[in-house]
Curated annotation (Swiss-Prot):
InterPro entries: DNA-dir_RNA_pol_omega, Pol_omega/Rpo6/RPB6
EC number: 2.7.7.6
A GO term, aspect molecular function: DNA binding
Tree of life domain: Bacteria
A Pfam match: RNA_pol_Rpb6
Quaternary structure (record): In cyanobacteria the RNAP catalytic core is composed of 2 alpha, 1 beta, 1 beta', 1 gamma and 1 omega subunit. When a sigma factor is associated with the core the holoenzyme is formed, which can initiate transcription.
GO cellular component assignments: DNA-directed RNA polymerase complex
UniProt record, GO biological process: DNA-templated transcription
Entry function: Promotes RNA polymerase assembly. Latches the N- and C-terminal regions of the beta' subunit thereby facilitating its interaction with the beta and alpha subunits.
Similarity field: Belongs to the RNA polymerase subunit omega family.
Keywords carried by this UniProt record: DNA-directed RNA polymerase, Nucleotidyltransferase, Transcription, Transferase
Catalysis: reaction(s): RNA(n) + a ribonucleoside 5'-triphosphate = RNA(n+1) + diphosphate
Name of this protein: DNA-directed RNA polymerase subunit omega
Length: 78
């Protein structure tokens, strides 16, 4: 999935990723809070100029990132 271009983003894929995060979690509330916290971090990173300008919204980006982390834990450092 191309994260940098909003026109290429498949909203059905985004919905499936969000549902997958909720379904695989043990606590739906904490998962929702993690998504919101990650989105808030991305939003402030965008304001600080730490991230390149992106057409994708912070909540959408956080769902994609958390879904990728959940589905591919071997890609995480550490």
């Amino acid at each position: 999935m191309n994260v940098s271009n909003n026109s290429n983003m498949d909203h059905n894929d985004l919905a499936k990723r969000g549902e997958s995060l909720i379904r695989k979690s043990t606590n739906r509330y904490l998962t929702t809070v993690r998504i919101a916290f990650r989105a808030k971090q991305r939003r402030f990173d965008d304001f600080d100029g730490l991230l390149e300008e992106s057409a994708i919204k912070p909540v959408q980006r956080s769902i994609i990132e958390l879904s990728d982390e959940q589905d591919q834990p071997d890609l995480l450092p550490g």
